[in-house]
Each structure stands twice: as structure tokens, then as C-alpha cells.
Amino acid sequence: MTKAARGAAAQPLDREFIRKVNRALLAWYAATARPLKIRERSDPYSVLVSEVMAQQTQISRVDQLATTFLARFPTLESLAAAETADVLVAWKGLGYNRRALALQRAAAAAVAAGGLPSSVEALIELPGIGPYTARAVAAIAFGGREIPVDVNIARIVARLADSDAPLSPREVQLRANEFGAELADGEAGAWAQAAMDLASSTCRAAAPKCDECPLREHCPSAGRTFAKAPRSGEPRTPFTKTARWLRRRLLDELREAGRAGAQVAGERGEHNEAAVAATINKMVSEGLAESLGGDRYRLPHRGD
């Protein structure tokens, strides 16, 4: 690929180049894939659960907790019918708990429709399911050809496209789909998982290990230097002072309290009573808690 072609997102990549990259990446993945337990299950429901979990949680933690979650809610129907409180208890350790609510809503919608759909377009219509998750489920569970693109896969695609200028999300997806178009049926899911492994181990944002990369003979960006993102000059706020810490603390208290609920009043760590009250009220509005009257709250339950 010539230097002049860099950044020209409208011009398709060479098909033979794409085929060589695909063969090299899939061969590397077949030999070195991370031994993740979640990859042992490729049924649509398990893939949906693991992909929603992995949106904002490290894959090592997802791998530890997904098995337990799936044992507690082994089917789409069991998750849809569960008490939301039980789902939130099982979600402990994954963070960003609104994802658990969205996952349960998606399960309920899918059950009402007769099961998880197989197309990207239909999956996106489910509550809380965005383009990446829809493409990941379609590719991994149903053999779809569209490559799911997150920030890690976007980085690899941009480097393979030899783009000096940042590509827009649409341009990255179009480039990724060029690779998907040259894959055999059912290979797009493996390609995406391979790219995730490559991004984690080799094709890193600021310090890629090009000499260890299985694509080094084909990648036009091999050996280039990539600058680190500038750090903010402001000191980082200690986690115990953040709203996330307070939400986690209150949610854990409600998890421990069970159906009877817990008294939520007073200070928590470095957060005053007003901050605690504002946070629990927001959690109620988001569906993460429900009021029992006064200062008593619990996780959401359907009855009583």
C-alpha cells in the first residue's frame, strides 16, 4: 500500500492483502488463543451475557464471574423471569450495574419475541444493545459476517489501513467489514476474538510490540511510533471520594440486606448525608433500588 493511500477511507483495501491478513490472524489465534472459559460457550444467550459484561469490565474478571452468573441464570427465560434484586446480587464485582438491568430487559424482550434474533439490525432493537454488542453476538453466535468494532479493534483496523488521520466510527466499520467480506462463513467471530487478543498482547495503543506481531509482514504500520495520549494535569480524585465509590457502597449494603432492606441515612466515608440521599434517590430513579418508606431501601422486587 502506498503512502498516498493513507487515510483514503473511500478507496477499498487490496483484497489479496486482506486475505493474507485474515489467514495470518486466524492461524495465530488458533495456536495462541487465550484460554477463556467464556469462549467455551458459543450459544447466543451465553455470548450475549459475556459481551454485555465485557463492555466496561476487564475480560479476566468477566471470565471469573460469567460462569457463576450463567449457572444462576442458565437460560434467556430464567434471566427474564428473575427478580431484579437477584440479578443485581449476581452482578456483584462487575461494576456499572445498570448493564445488569439492561441485560434483563433485553432478555425479557427477546423472550417475548420468541428468542434472540440473529441479525445485527434486530439485535440492536433490543433494550440496551448497541452496535458493537449486536455485531459481536451476530458474528460469534450466529456466524454473521460483520466485524464488531470497539476501541481495540478500531486501533488494529486503522493501522492495517495505514491511516495517518483518525478514522471516523463509520469509516472504521467499513474497513472492518472489508476484512469480514473475505472471511468464510462463521469466521468473523473468531476474527474479532483474535483481534481482541492481539490488541491486548501485541498491538497496544502507545507501545505496540511489532516484532512479536503475527501481522508484521503485512501491516503497513509495523515499526511506526505512536504517541501516548496526554495526561490531564489535574490530580486524580481518590476513588473513595467519587460518586462511583458511594454508589458501589450503597448497592453492596442493599445486596447484603436482602428483601427486608436497609436503613440508608447518614454519612458514608467522605460523603455527607446530602450526597448519600441524592445518590440513593438517583439509584431509585434508575431502577437500582426501591424505597420502603422513610430512609429504608432495598433492591427491586416484583411483589410485596
Regions found by a protein language model. Name each.
Residues 284-297:
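A short, conserved structural fragment
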Residues 8-17, 176, 283:
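Short, charged low-complexity linear motifs
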Residues 2-14, 32-34:
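Short, contiguous pre-domain boundary segments
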Residues 303-304:
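Short, amphipathic alpha-helical interaction segments positioned at domain boundaries
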Residues 17, 23-24, 28-240, 244-245, ...:
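Catalytic cores of DNA base-excision repair glycosylases
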Residues 270-284:
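Short amphipathic alpha-helical interaction segments
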Residues 45, 299-300:
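Short secondary-structure capping/turn micro-motifs that flank functional sites
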